[in-house]
Amino acid sequence: MHETPEDMERLQALLDRSIERAGAFLRSSFEMPERSLSAGQLVRYLQGNQTVAFATVTAKGEPRVAPIGSLFFRGRFYIPTVATAARTRMITARPAVSLTHFAGIDLAIIVHGNATTIPADHADFASLEAMQRAASGSSVQDWGEGVYLRVEADTLVTFARYPEQFPA
């Protein structure tokens, strides 16, 4: 785990705010907060590379979604990619994104927010590269002009059918 105590507090506050702002139907269907994960449970679960459905928006306002690997570092999702990828260009112009990680009908992690590009000269880049290499054996720099997309979540909701199976 790379999260500081401040990261954990920020993440738990985001989770709590997201539950408070959720509509009645979502709170009911996700059985919030009883079946929600805590910051500690989420961080422990999201170790390594996790596949997410990552959604961006085209210049025409059309949604684009694709499965892609992600890293969870200091309480935020990061998407390894290259600067020339269509998703990177879309985010530069229109930073609103959504992502979802799920495991059948027993687990869902849903994020809405904005993404920014993290280039090689960013302070977090070396740590992200080490995580990426450990998780997948490759580096975004192996792909060309590698970058990471950092998702700053406005909303982060979780559902775990069996939350007790997720240690904190």
Task: Identify what each model region corresponds to.
Residues 1-34, 105-168:
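Charged, gly/pro-rich active-site loop segments
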Residues 21, 48-49, 93-94:
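Structured helix-beta-strand junction loops
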Residues 24-52:
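Short, basic/aromatic recognition patches
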Residues 42, 87-90, 124-128:
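Amphipathic alpha-helical interface surfaces
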Residues 43-44, 69, 89, 139-141:
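Short secondary-structure boundary/capping segments
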Residues 49-83, 89, 97-101, 110-111:
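Short beta-strand segments
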Residues 92-97, 130-133:
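Short, intrinsically disordered, mixed-charge
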